[in-house]
A protein has these predicted regions:
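Extended, low-hydrophobicity, polar/charged segments
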Residues: 1-187
Length: 187
């Protein structure tokens, strides 16, 4: 039945000459892990999609994935060092203060899944955390950015921008983007 419906939409849009893609999309809390949507290709609109001209891959930006290439890093591993970073509340501030590229910084964002489960998501500093992908990675129904009060309950008097993956409570689940795997001597 699904294939018949998909074919019907595909045939209609093809017949009228619409430049379109069937894309991988988020089905939301009620719809399972993913769904397929038909999207017209346009310079305007409410959605951003990633697609390939060489294949039939297409997804909305929340569901898009890239091909991860593991790299052999020849950088010499330095000793871990504690550095005071006063008044650096953003990735941009930290990169400027330490004179490093944003891609060398680990960005950590704390979420609360299903109302009470702390999740720490980690990406490169020049990337953004995708809440939908975090929700799907931990199998949660709902996810939201942790409030200041929730952060204080878990970590004490640590500002949100200073929470990181070191010495965490076992109750915190850590989810990291694959690109973090290639990072050496990160901040």
């Amino acid at each position: 039945m699904y294939n018949d419906i998909w074919s019907a939409y595909n045939n209609i849009f093809t017949r009228i000459g619409l430049d379109f893609r069937s894309i991988i999309a988020d089905a939301g809390a009620m719809g399972g892990r993913e769904s397929i949507e038909f999207i017209a290709i346009s310079d305007v609109g409410e959605d951003t999609i990633a697609y390939s001209e060489e294949s039939d891959y297409a997804a909305n930006i929340e569901m898009a994935s890239s091909k991860f290439k593991e790299r052999t890093n020849t950088e010499v591993q330095l000793q871990k060092e504690v550095v005071d970073t006063p008044a650096t509340t953003t990735i941009e501030d930290l990169a400027s203060f330490l004179d490093v590229k944003e891609s060398k910084i680990l960005k950590s964002v704390l979420f609360v899944a299903d109302g009470n489960k702390p999740i720490l998501a980690i990406v490169r500093g020049d990337h953004e955390v995708n809440e939908i992908k975090v929700r799907m990675a931990v199998g949660a129904e709902t996810i939201e950015t942790a409030s200041e009060a929730h952060i204080e309950d878990l970590f004490g008097n640590i500002p949100a921008g200073y929470v990181g993956p070191v010495d965490l409570s076992e109750e915190v689940t850590i989810v990291a983007d694959l690109y973090v795997k290639n990072m050496v001597n990160s901040v």
